[in-house]
């Protein structure tokens, strides 16, 4: 029995040591070309009411509680959500809009607390606009441990890819 406990203690210590070497910040990013100029894309990003048409997280729990405050759109627009199972809870605020993109401050409450910055950056292309969606934030110790067992870039990146595909559809059909 003592031998099993010793092995377990060594495994836990190893996991904690490896986790402590992971970066203190995270960065996730995906991009997609949308067949439209930035001025056609921006309205879908600066009005949180329009996010329901393309956001991957809105589809997790279509009946989640939503609230909107601040400006109707653009800088100062705010959105909060509270899901019962999958979507968690948090809030977003648009803090910057310019010809190169949109910046959104995110505050997660559930399933864990975190503050991140999401950016939508526009790069003109011959056939439209390359929209790069990125998110940067702190990598907590528990996040580092979790990251040892789950590929967070793959998980978050998949959501970004789904969201960008939905945004592309919303803009191009718009």
Located regions from the model:
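Conserved short-loop catalytic and cofactor-binding motifs
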Residues: 29, 67, 82, 148-151
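Hydrophobic-ligand binding "helix-grip"
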Residues: 2-23, 60, 80-130
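Extracytoplasmic ligand-binding sensor domains of the Cache superfamily
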Residues: 73-76
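Beta-strand/loop substructures that line and gate deep hydrophobic ligand-binding cavities in soluble
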Residues: 101, 106-162, 167-169, 173
């Amino acid at each position: 029995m003592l031998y099993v406990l010793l092995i377990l203690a060594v495994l836990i210590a190893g996991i904690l040591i490896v986790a402590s070497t992971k970066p203190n910040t995270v960065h996730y990013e995906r991009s997609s070309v949308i067949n439209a100029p930035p001025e056609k894309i921006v309205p879908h990003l600066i009005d949180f009411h329009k996010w329901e048409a393309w956001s991957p997280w809105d589809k997790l729990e279509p009946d989640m509680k939503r609230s909107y405050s601040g400006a109707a759109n653009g800088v100062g627009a705010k959105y909060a959500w509270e899901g019962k199972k999958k979507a968690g809870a948090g809030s977003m605020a648009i803090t910057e809009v310019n010809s190169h993109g949109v910046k959104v401050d995110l505050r997660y409450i559930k399933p864990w607390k975190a503050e991140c910055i999401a950016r939508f950056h526009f790069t003109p292309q011959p056939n439209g606009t390359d929209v790069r969606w990125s998110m940067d934030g702190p990598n907590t110790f528990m996040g580092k441990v979790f990251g040892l067992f789950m590929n967070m870039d793959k998980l978050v990146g998949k959501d970004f890819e789904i969201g960008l595909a939905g945004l592309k559809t919303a803009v191009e059909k718009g």
